[in-house]
């Protein structure tokens, strides 16, 4: 079982099979929320470095579902996953399930994304829980760090139309 530190104020808690991330982005909550709910946007930033993403289905509403695949650009191998949107508050909160199609990666994860407007942009907090035992939580954490770096590069520039 993996234990990942969860930071609550100045206290560090350890939760099995979970990761917790926190960032501040120089972009509005509306723009960050759109990056999570637009097919083309999420395909550009969610996969970690070296992976491509295909979004097969994305119905962003409570009870709606999504399905996507990540393909390793080096080897060509891919894995597919999907889930359901459990809770949505535009520009504030997304909570959704994640389930791999591979039977060797059992269980259902829960991902919670909280957005809060701050003076310089948006504070984003992400918690992913119930990561399958066969996936090191550190690997998920590293993947999320890479994804959030790509998200930042998508949402922070303010490029006017020509």
Feature roles, as predicted:
Residues 22, 95-145, 162:
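Beta-strand/loop substructures that line and gate deep hydrophobic ligand-binding cavities in soluble
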Residues 29-30, 58-62, 86-93, 114-123:
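A short, structured loop/turn motif at beta-sheet edges
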Residues 16-22, 29, 53, 65, ...:
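Intrinsic-disorder/low-complexity, polar/charged segments enriched in Ser/Thr/Lys/Arg/Asp/Glu/Gln
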Residues 154-162:
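Short, highly charged C-terminal tails/helix-capping segments
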Residues 20-21, 40-78, 161-162:
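Short beta-edge strand/loop motif at the mouth of beta-sheet-based domains
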Residues 2-52:
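Hydrophobic ligand-binding cavity/cleft-lining segments
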């Amino acid at each position: 079982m993996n234990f990942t530190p969860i930071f609550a104020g100045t206290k560090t808690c350890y939760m099995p099979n979970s990761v917790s991330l926190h960032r501040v982005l120089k972009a509005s909550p509306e723009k960050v929320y759109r990056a999570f709910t637009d097919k083309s946007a999420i395909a550009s930033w969610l996969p970690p470095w070296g992976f491509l993403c295909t979004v097969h289905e994305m119905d962003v509403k409570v009870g709606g579902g999504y399905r996507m695949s990540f393909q390793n650009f080096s080897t060509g191998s891919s894995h597919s996953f999907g889930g359901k949107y459990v809770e949505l508050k535009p520009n504030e909160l997304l909570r959704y399930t994640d389930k791999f199609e591979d039977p060797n990666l059992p269980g259902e994860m829960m991902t919670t994304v909280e957005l809060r407007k701050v003076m310089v942009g948006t504070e984003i907090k992400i918690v992913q829980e119930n990561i399958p035992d066969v996936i090191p939580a550190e690997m998920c954490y590293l993947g999320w760090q890479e994804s959030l770096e790509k998200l930042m590069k998508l949402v922070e520039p303010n490029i006017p139309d020509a």
